[in-house]
Amino acid sequence: MKVQTGATGVLERTSHYLKAGLLRTKPAWFDVVGAHPPSTNLTKKPKLFETGGQKSDPSESIFTKINGEYKTRTSVEDRKQKNNSVSRVPKLQFLEDQLRDVFYHQHPWEFSRPKVLVETSGDDNSKCDWSHMLQFNKPLDGESVVQRTLWLLNRSKMDGKSITLFDAYDEARFEFYRLRMEEEMSSAVSREESTMYGAVFPSPHLEHGVNQEQEYIDIWTKVAGDATKVKTASKDGKSSNGSMGAEDVVEKTTSAWETEFVEEESS
């Protein structure tokens, strides 16, 4: 019996198996497929596009005669996968990401400002009213410029005005500059007023760390200066007295580093 590979012959084969006793129980789908048999064979078959026909194995075309010689093995170029971008998953590209990249390349110091690392739902910007850049529940940053630019573009389409992406970005950027200057000016004025009324501002953690480090740097600078003087004096004594003058040079039993700290502890 010829083996049937087509999916349309499954009903016929199953009926033969039932009559021959190979299958004892009827499958659950037997009656359904018998009432509604498949009408289309979905098996893919090779198509002959040329009159001369198509070779069964496409790799045979590699070893054709080229310049009077036969190729005995495939080269790297033959084995290279061509059109590999067809099966590659395309990258998601958004206009917002391009605007963020442009803004933070033009304003790298915006990265130094503190950020609130709180997990959100991801659509908090859609809940804000971007008809104005300054928001109540969101600090002023580069994301404000991005969302304000998108709002200006969408608004221009609704009003029927022709505004380019660069014009919308520049308008949002200059508005950001104005609000940032107002924010810094307000902060400076409030600090001066607080100082005038007797407020004392503690040094920040960074400045405190620098001051602590500077104290040790000053100590080691003085110790290094004394050690340099001792080393220079010993060299001058050896050069003036010659080899015989080495006996007159008194060696120090303690280093200059230890002496400095001992003097500080005693004082």
UniProtKB/Swiss-Prot annotation:
Q: Name one Pfam family in it.
A: MRP-S25
Q: Recall the GO molecular function terms of this protein's record.
A: structural constituent of ribosome
Chief subcellular location equals mitochondrion
Q: Name one GO cellular component term.
A: mitochondrial small ribosomal subunit
Which InterPro entries does its entry note? Ribosomal_mS23_fun
Any keyword Repeat? no
The lineage's top-level taxon is Eukaryota
Could you tell me the keywords of this UniProt record?
A: Mitochondrion, Ribonucleoprotein, Ribosomal protein
**Sequence segments annotated as region (Disordered):** 230-267
Report the subcellular localization: Mitochondrion
Record note on quaternary structure: Component of the mitochondrial small ribosomal subunit.
* Similarity field: Belongs to the mitochondrion-specific ribosomal protein mS23 family.
The record's section on PANTHER family has: 37S RIBOSOMAL PROTEIN S25, MITOCHONDRIAL, SMALL RIBOSOMAL SUBUNIT PROTEIN MS23
The protein in question is named: Small ribosomal subunit protein mS23
This protein's species is Meyerozyma guilliermondii (strain ATCC 6260 / CBS 566 / DSM 6381 / JCM 1539 / NBRC 10279 / NRRL Y-324) (Yeast)
